[in-house]
Structure formats: structure tokens, C-alpha cells
Regions:
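Amphipathic alpha-helical segments that line or abut small-molecule/effector binding pockets
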Residues: 119-130, 200, 204
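Conserved Rossmann-fold NAD(P)-dependent oxidoreductase catalytic core, especially the SDR/UDP-sugar
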Residues: 24-56, 74-77
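Short-chain dehydrogenase/reductase
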Residues: 17-18, 52-63, 89, 114-115, ...
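NAD(P)H-binding glycine-rich loop region in Rossmannoid oxidoreductase-like domains
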Residues: 1-22, 29, 43-49
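Amphipathic terminal alpha-helices
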Residues: 193-208
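NAD(P)-dependent short-chain dehydrogenase/reductase
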Residues: 64-113, 118-122
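Residue-level signal for the nucleotide or nucleotide-sugar donor/cofactor binding architecture
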Residues: 90, 113-116, 144-147, 178, ...
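Mid/C-terminal beta-alpha module of Rossmann-like enzyme folds, strongest
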Residues: 131-180
Length: 208
């Protein structure tokens, strides 16, 4: 399992990205390349509005390196993960912090995000790993529903009983999809229900 890297998707520091790649290169020289390498990437690679983002470019370069360098691999692309984390750079943590501290933030009007519970990611991943047919694939583990940013913020406002203060910014991309066809059976096997209350229940679980 290789689960290290730049944690801030807004990072633009080239030195950090070079360090990230060097770490993987060094790691690849120390392990048996016939073993399956599990790497966590990002579903944001599917979002055309972010294809020039340095963080996204770095993820793509690493994915390509893995595909060329390892005989066996499984690349898991993840959306916005919700769980117990002190990383203030994650989208949900960012919104909760800004709203609770009554700080103004920019709200991207056109942006859409898939949000999933880390526990559900774990369940789906375990189910996938039990099937070796998934070796040498790139798989999205995501909630099929993409929520608008203003909807996510409205749920947080409802849960915290606080009013968010933000500036509307005409950014983001609405017309992009996350292909979850490779995890449909796993979702059924794990009995995960991405229903209309999913987002609110997940946010309540970790933040309220």
C-alpha cells in the first residue's frame, strides 16, 4: 500500500511535487515489483475544470509511472472523503471550520463534488481486493451522486445552526462524471445506500 503524498489539493509548490515523485521512485526501487501496489489517487482527474491544477497533474504523472513500472497494481481514485481527520485542507473540514469560525470563503457556483464516508471506502476496497481480477486497473470508489457546493454548505448550515458567509464565484464544472461501473457489485455486496439522506447522515456522524 502506498498512501503518502501531497495532502493539499490547492498546493502549487513544485518542490513538494518533486519530493512526492522522488519518494515513490525510491520506494519502487526497494520493493518486489511483482507484488500488487495499491495507490490512492483522486477522482478529480475526471474534472475538466481542474486539469491544469498542479496537484492533479502530479497525480496523473504518478499514475502513469506506476502503470509503466509495476507488473501488478491497483489504482484507487477517491472523491471527497469524510472521516476523522485534522487535515484542514479537505473540502468538508474547510467548510465546517470557516462556518463555525464565521469566516468568509469563496463558494464555487458551478462546482460539484462526490462525497463518501471513509468507512464505505474501506468496505468497498476490501470487497475489491478479494477479487484478484481487479489487478492492473484504475477504479473510482465514489458516491455516484455529485452535490453542488451550495447544497453541501446548506447541509452544514442546517447541522450547525449557523449561517455561512461566502462570496459567490463563477468557477467549477458541472458536466463531468465519475465512472463507478467497476464498483456496482461491491456497493451491493456491502449494502451501501447512497440515498437522499446519505450526505447529511455522514456529516452528522463525524462533525456533530
Amino acid at each position: 500500500v502506498y498512501a503518502v503524498g501531497v495532502s493539499n489539493s490547492l498546493c502549487k509548490d513544485k518542490k513538494l511535487f518533486e519530493k512526492d515523485k522522488k519518494r515513490l521512485y525510491d520506494f519502487s526501487n526497494k520493493i518486489n515489483k511483482n507484488k500488487v501496489l495499491l495507490y490512492f489517487s483522486t477522482c478529480a482527474l475526471n474534472d475538466p475544470s481542474r486539469n491544469q491544477n498542479p496537484y492533479i497533474k502530479n497525480k496523473l504523472e504518478i499514475e502513469n509511472f506506476i502503470k509503466k513500472s509495476f507488473a501488478k497494481y491497483l489504482i484507487i481514485r477517491l472523491p471527497e472523503i469524510v472521516g476523522k481527520s485534522n487535515n484542514s485542507n479537505t473540502l468538508i473540514n474547510f467548510f465546517f471550520k470557516r462556518i463555525r469560525e464565521k469566516e468568509v470563503f469563496d463558494l464555487w457556483v458551478n462546482a460539484r463534488r462526490s462525497v463518501i464516508d471513509i468507512d464505505d471506502v474501506t468496505k468497498i476496497l476490501i470487497d475489491l481486493l478479494s477479487n484478484k481480477k481487479h489487478e492492473n486497473r484504475t477504479i473510482n470508489i465514489a458516491n455516484p451522486k455529485k452535490y453542488s457546493i451550495d447544497y453541501i454548505v446548506s447541509i452544514i448550515e442546517d447541522l450547525t445552526v449557523l449561517k455561512a458567509e461566502y462570496n459567490l464565484v463563477n468557477k467549477g464544472e458541472t458536466n463531468w462524471e465519475i465512472d463507478i461501473s467497476q464498483i456496482v457489485n461491491s456497493i451491493k455486496n456491502c449494502k451501501i445506500k447512497f440515498n437522499k439522506n446519505y450526505l447529511k447522515n455522514v456529516l452528522k456522524k463525524y462533525f456533530i
